[in-house]
Regions:
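NAD(P)H-binding glycine-rich loop region in Rossmannoid oxidoreductase-like domains
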Residues: 43-81
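Short alpha-helix in the Rossmann-fold core of NAD(P)-dependent oxidoreductases
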Residues: 64, 79-86, 102-105, 135-136
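Conserved Rossmann-fold NAD(P)-dependent oxidoreductase catalytic core, especially the SDR/UDP-sugar
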Residues: 61, 87-131, 151
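Glycine/proline-rich active-site loop of Rossmann-fold NAD(P)-dependent oxidoreductases
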Residues: 137, 159-167
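Active-site Tyr-X1-5-Lys
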Residues: 127-151
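N-terminal Rossmann/SDR dinucleotide-binding element
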Residues: 1-58
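Conserved catalytic-core motifs of eukaryotic protein kinase domains, centered on the activation segment
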Residues: 29-31, 69-77, 112-118, 164
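Conserved sequence/active-site signature of Rossmann-fold short-chain dehydrogenase/reductase
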Residues: 66, 109-110, 158-160
Length: 167
């Protein structure tokens, strides 16, 4: 969902990009420019050659399973996707000298009560209240140790109107 909107923005601004998605929880029919997309998983063996051949210098990582209640029931699947595959992808980026890495994390790294939300601060220690938040927290630490230039965006719930598109 978020990755789609990032690509849509880049396409409309005519900025260069290339997207990767396994479409396990989205539809490829929404892709604006199918020539700039590859249907594969982030731990696929072809990612390394793709990254080196495209001369990529910045990566925006938006791939994750992202439903906190589901993460509590399916920890193995969330570990495999959000931690193991993501670490493999990050290591490929490091190996291919990616200069900038933008990781879309989550407000779920904070431990807060949704009924009593206080302002979250970046100086707070990560204390995830669910397994999804824990996977994001683990990768935040991993990213910080791998890239000289990295940005971590702790997004809160994102939703909005999209005309005639299904996700």
């Amino acid at each position: 969902y978020i990755g789609f909107h990032i690509c849509e923005f880049l396409e409309l601004k005519r900025l260069p990009y290339f997207g990767i998605d396994n479409f396990s929880r989205s539809h490829s029919k929404n892709i604006i420019n199918k020539k700039k997309f590859l249907k594969t998983d982030i731990n696929s063996k072809i990612i390394s050659s793709l990254v080196s051949s495209k001369k990529i210098h910045t990566v925006i990582h938006a791939a994750a399973l992202s439903f906190p209640p589901e993460s509590e029931k399916n920890k193995k699947i969330y570990f495999e996707n959000n931690i193991k595959k993501t670490k493999t992808f990050i290591d490929v980026c490091v190996k291919n000298n990616i200069k900038k890495f933008i990781f879309l994390s989550s407000s779920n790294v904070y431990n807060f009560n949704p009924n009593n939300i206080k302002a979250a601060s970046e100086s707070q220690k990560n204390k995830p209240s669910n397994y999804y938040g824990k996977t994001k927290s683990i990768i935040e630490k991993y990213v910080k140790n791998k890239f000289e230039i990295c940005y971590i965006l702790r997004l809160f719930n994102i939703a909005g109107y999209i005309n005639k598109k299904e996700f």
